[in-house]
């Protein structure tokens, strides 16, 4: 695995996105930290960093474990060591790619809206967890937000801040709730959430490249349409992932600073992008 990364804060504060890799470059962990509604100081970045480091530590000790079990163990340890309580803990989305050298397989895990994109010899595949997106799409608050932004209300006004707060509160009612048909699952102080992660495995011979990205980077392709997946793949190779996330950020600020074209929560979200190349080096 050859790994290249790009990261960028959405602006005005440190990024809460994280990319971590194992020392032997066979494991990539990408997380999008989420602070609680009541945090005076944002803790999402701290949580993402701490969980990512713990995941790698658990993996290094027990590489035979599947990714769900490894994540569950890491969640248990972080919650226990730091006294985190469900519903009042910072959280993180997570996406993980692991190369298993002993049997020439590649594993991927996705929990919440941080996808993994796979370029195989016959095309592209996106491994995603759509439960949060489905929940948001069903909320009437989302429709209000879209209408306000398309009408030119912008991101700075009290109306936008109010509806975003309502959306967050709506989401919190359904986070990590067993038996809730609208539940979505995220890394937080409920270790069992790991059992609900989306997982896949492929023979390494089937894969050319993979990309792991937070939703801020994904928006450049699926929301803004700046590239097709094939063009995005070529751009990552030609100019590198840092210039790709820079280009997405520039588009948001230069071409749609008020969210009229593409309604969203804020002008720019944090962005993290890891590019993984499995092709033999020359």
Predicted regions and their residues:
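PP2C/PPM-type serine/threonine phosphatase catalytic domain
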Residues: 1-282
